[in-house]
From Swiss-Prot:
Biological process, per Gene Ontology: trans-translation
Lineage: superkingdom: Bacteria
Keywords, sorted A to Z: Cytoplasm, RNA-binding
Gene transcribed to yield this protein: smpB
Listed name of the protein: SsrA-binding protein
HAMAP family linked: SmpB
Subcellular location: Cytoplasm
């Protein structure tokens, strides 16, 4: 009998939940990330955070700053800094496009989520975003509450 082929399902590893609330997302791009083996193991265990992280373009390379990856507890060879800069892997054309987009005033590169693709490689979804003002945030909260109330009313009838 032939064996059933098992499909690997990879779930989303980390998500920057505040990003969609604090920023207006204009464009997104998926990038690879350069990590060491022990860092990948920590991310698979969910011991990483994208809060307060951002990306910069320096000398034609994209770098991710302030991404917290807790050191893997069974790693005895090297101890890495949890918030070190990590290189993002993009094509030159994509980097040039991002550079032209963020050259506008008030735009930034913000990571939205990190996930494992079907091949098991860690990918990062970056967004070109513009910061929201306080009144925009209040409007978002109002809209969310109105949607919730509508759903409750629909459920009753």
């Amino acid at each position: 009998m032939a064996k059933k082929q098992q499909t690997k399902t990879y779930t989303q590893a980390i998500q920057n939940r505040k990003a969609r609330f604090e920023f207006e997302i204009l464009d997104t791009v998926v990038a690879g990330i350069e990590l060491l083996g022990s860092e990948v193991k920590s991310v698979r265990l969910g011991k990483a955070s994208l809060n307060e992280s951002f990306a910069i373009i320096h000398h034609g390379e994209v770098w991710l700053e302030n991404m917290q990856i807790t050191p893997y507890e069974f790693n005895h060879l090297d101890s890495l800094e949890p918030k070190r800069s990590r290189k993002l892997l993009l094509h030159k054309a994509e980097i040039a496009k991002l550079q032209s987009q963020i050259s506008e005033k008030g735009l930034a590169l913000i990571p939205l989520k990190a996930f494992f693709n079907p091949k098991g490689v860690l990918k990062l979804e970056l967004a070109v975003a513009k910061g929201k003002k306080l009144f925009d945030k209040r409007e978002t909260i109002k809209n969310r509450d109105n949607e919730r109330q509508l759903q409750q009313i629909k459920k009753q009838y």
